[in-house]
Every structure is written in structure tokens, then in C-alpha cells.
Amino acid sequence: NPQVIAYYAGDEKSIDEFELEGVDQLIYSFLHLKGNQLAIDNEADSLTLLNVVNQKKKYPKLKVLVSLGGWGGCKTCSDVFSTEEDRIAFAISTAQIIASYQADGIDLDWEYPGISGFPGHKYQPEDRENFTDLVVQLRKYMKEGDILSFAAGANSDGYFEQSIEWDKVMPLVDNVNLMTYDFYGSGSSKTGHHTPLGSGEFKEGSAVSSIQALMNLGVKPE
């Protein structure tokens, strides 16, 4: 069945203003790395996450995840996730945060493994295999039933081919959340829709073409 999945990057109080009936997953964004550990940046973020999780009392079907990274938020990911020891340490810390906050899982938003993302952030070809093992370790240390997903850069050249080992990763995750936006922006030479459903006159990239690209790689819609 289709799911409604939303990201939340607001403050502690604003979440109370939203009607969350019908939302399946709410992903709190963003947590970051502190050394090789998943970390909450400050007390304000901790209070916000607590209140987001508290929404489950009002909406019993709601699942709350935390998200690692975001645009510019994964500066050390390539280095940290380059060793098995650090990947295991991250997985253990993630399981601890999920349990202590009574959350339901994690969404990985590393932009991007193996290809250029945020300017100046390190990337290397080995990121692709390291991402796979990161997912393996998370599955190993998270408890059964915890949700594991990742955000995929549909608008990034080479992402589908160079960032993810789809055949190995997809059996281990619950969802892949396609970032089907930023197809046009301030650096574009022509105007176009920021988040196109279908391909346009000047660019093939769109929600439809991104989903088709995943299916061509063997990723099943369900």
C-alpha cells in the first residue's frame, strides 16, 4: 500500500500545529555524526525529537524515524564509514538512540556515496560498498521491526549507477525515498519545474524517469 512519509525539520512546538492523521512516517531531520557516533546536536534538538515522538500518543499508527545527514550534513561520512569498526560503532549508537527516544528507525541521507555532493565534502569510489555494509551493520544491531530507509539523489548525475549497490541494499531496507526535486535551480541555463512529474522539453529528469531508472535496475515498486 502507498505510504505518506514526511520530513520534519521544525522546532519543538511547531509540530503540535500539524494534523498528522494519515501520515505513516515522520522523519525528524537531521542528526549528524560526532566522531563515529550518531549524535543529537544540542538540547533543543533533543527536546524537539522527544515531542515529535510524543505525537505517537495522539496518532497511534504514526512511526517516527530520525535522519542522518541532509544536504551539507554528512561532511565526514566518507571517512567515518570507510572502516568496519566505525560502521559498527555507528550502528550501535543508532540502535541506542532509537531505543532511548522510543523512535522507530533511521533514514540515511548521505549526499552522496561515491559521487560529488555538497561542495568540498569528500567522496570516493569505495563509498558504494561501504554504504552497503553500513546498511548490513544497521540491520544487525537495530532491533527487529525497526525501519531502515535512505534518501536517494534522483537529480544527481551518476547516483543510480555509482552510489548504491541496489541488488544488495534493497533486500535490507524498508523504503528508498527518492529526492525528485532540484532538477532546475539557480545554476540552470533554462527554466523548468523544480519538481517535475514528467520529463520536459529541456531535461529528461523527472519523478517518472527516476522511478523508471530504479525499476530498470531491478528495484521492485513494492
Where are these regions (language model features)?
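Generic structural signal for hydrophobic
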Residues: 18, 97-101, 169, 214
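Short, well-ordered coil/turn segments that N-cap beta-strands
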Residues: 2, 60-64, 102-106, 144-146, ...
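Glycan-recognition patch characteristic of GH18 chitinases/ENGases
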Residues: 1-98
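Gly/Ser/Thr-rich helix-start
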Residues: 70-71, 106, 193
